[in-house]
Amino acid sequence: MSVPAQTSVLIVGGGPAGSYAATVLAREGVDVVLLEAEKFPRYHIGESMLASIRFFLRFVELEEEFDRHGFEKKYGATFKITEKNPAYTDFAASLGEGGYSWNVVRSESDEIIFRYAGKCGAKTFDGTKVESLTFEPYPHEGFDESVHLANPGRPVSANWSRKDGSSGVIKFDYIIDGSGRNGLISTKYLKNRSFNQGLKNIANWTYWKGAKRFNVGEKNENSPLFEALKDGSGWVWAIPLHNDTISVGVVARQDAFFEKKKESGLSGEAFYKEYLKLAPQIKNELLRDATIVSDIKQATDWSYSASAYAGPNFRLIGDAGCFVDPYFSSGCHLAMTSALSASVSIQAVRRGQCDELTGAKWHTTKVAEGYTRFLLLVMTVQRQLRMKDKNIISTDEEEGFDMAFKKIQPVIQGVADTRTEDEQTQRRAAEAVDFSLESFEITPEKQAAVISKIERSQAEPELLEKLTPEEVHILGNIVNRTFEREKDELNLTHFTGDMIDGYSAKLEHGNIGLYKREKALLNGTASRAAAVLKSIHQVA
């Protein structure tokens, strides 16, 4: 089958974001073409999945296939941040007793979703790269950065090529950019990507065989382990996989990485092993009798965002729009959240439920808020990593970080985007984001000052090191209260509970889209909470 000359929705990129969007839309009867530059199976890092992945897969009836494939079951994750007891996020809190997600081999899991999109009716082509787009003028005053939108014109066609020398043009009504970090629209046409200066890291990783199982006989047996480096420069992941290997990677601040490399005079595998010594539990316990079975891989791990994730007839999803440090394994969660958002916002316009401006604004807001939730958490935990012995997210009395992680658990398991629309729970969440800290006798002025420092620290990371004890106290409570949620139903109905500009998502098979809501589920703090998230995101 050759790439058609025209389609209703063109999706660029066959990763989890693009393939999931193609699946959702194809199941709605939409004419979809999905183009992936590489040939499957292709390698990708990012093996640890959040609990929320089950909800997304369940929505498109793909959950059972993931189970049948035999991926390593993930019942939670363990975080060793300081010498205090490690914290464990138990997926039973969101998936029920015995509930699990997976650690996946991405070359396999990504291909499963890509092929499934084809089974659902999407026309899928791998080894087919989109080289450029053609735009037509789209005169509309509403599409501007003041509402986090962009207007380079309306994209109407794409030029593609294959390694066999063939090429062509495909016209479309809509385009969804899931091209990953290459970010076709964001980097080539909008030029609106900005990097978080406080989260410029480098990752080195490889795969081992013969590793010891973590914490045998305990509740968190064989869970992924994330251990802070002893020098405070970063962290190490250890993720067991179903092919009898374990993925082990070092994530370190770029400046610390190159300084240590220069001082040691080492490179490649020797330098990687030297850095691992700063994570003694992983190095001395899990890897004691293990051997490396792959080459050492390296990649920049810079967190970034964009000033807009949508415009006239286009949507950005997954890493094509934004990327946040992978400490909480948020990549595939954010990919599928944004893919679903793009799908419902496009269908809403196609079905006459709203105009294009409203649909685009709904999507860009949804993406920005999801990204910012993880950004705020990562920045705070990063400070705890750097300030090893100071209590940032725990108290002097606590022996570990279980209380802090219990409060942020709905976010780091992805449940904040997949829970039920219980009014009381949502109101409490909104009030928390509004930083209602009266019980700590913290004035609005002090709150604003700390938020300002957090914002500026993204351009001046050293500001995180200069917070006063009082500011540290305020920041810790902001984070804890921001993400204090309750356990609730196990489905995607929270996605429908969010109201943006008066519209909420409808996730009904055969009729997905947006609908006008007469009554908000949240009280007046919701808009202020959203404003805070947006304000932090703007400078990310």
Curated annotation (Swiss-Prot):
Which terms are listed as keywords in the entry? FAD, Flavoprotein, Glycoprotein, Monooxygenase, Oxidoreductase, Signal
* Binding, chloride: 330-331
List of glycosylated residues:
159, 192, 204, 243, 480, 491, 523
Q: What happens when the gene is disrupted?
A: Abolishes completely the production of chloroisosulochrin and pestheic acid, whereas their non-chlorinated precursors, isosulochrin and RES-1214-1, still accumulate.
The recorded induction information for this protein reads: The cluster is expressed in rice fermentation medium. Expression is correlated with the production of pestheic acid. Three regulators are located in the cluster (ptaR1, ptaR2 and ptaR3), suggesting that the production of pestheic acid is controlled by a complex regulatory mechanism.
The yes or no answer to whether the keyword Membrane is present is: no
Q: Name one GO molecular function term.
A: flavin-dependent halogenase activity
Q: Which EC numbers characterise this protein's activity in its record? A: 1.14.14.-
Q: Which InterPro entries would you find in this protein's record? A: FAD/NAD-bd_sf, Flavin-dep_Halogenase_NPB, Flavin_halogenase
Q: From the UniProt record, give the pathway where this protein acts.
A: Secondary metabolite biosynthesis
Q: Does the keyword Acetylation apply?
A: no
The EC category is oxidoreductase
What does the record list as GO biological process? secondary metabolite biosynthetic process
The region annotated as signal peptide is 1-21
Annotated FAD binding lies at 14, 17, 47
* Similarity section: Belongs to the flavin-dependent halogenase family.
Q: What does this protein do?
A: Flavin-dependent halogenase; part of the gene cluster that mediates the biosynthesis of pestheic acid, a diphenyl ether which is a biosynthetic precursor of the unique chloropupukeananes. The biosynthesis initiates from condensation of acetate and malonate units catalyzed by the non-reducing PKS ptaA. As the ptaA protein is TE/CLC domain-deficient, hydrolysis and Claisen cyclization of the polyketide could be catalyzed by ptaB containing a beta-lactamase domain.
> What protein name does the entry list?
Flavin-dependent halogenase ptaM
Q: Which organism is it from?
A: Pestalotiopsis fici (strain W106-1 / CGMCC3.15140)
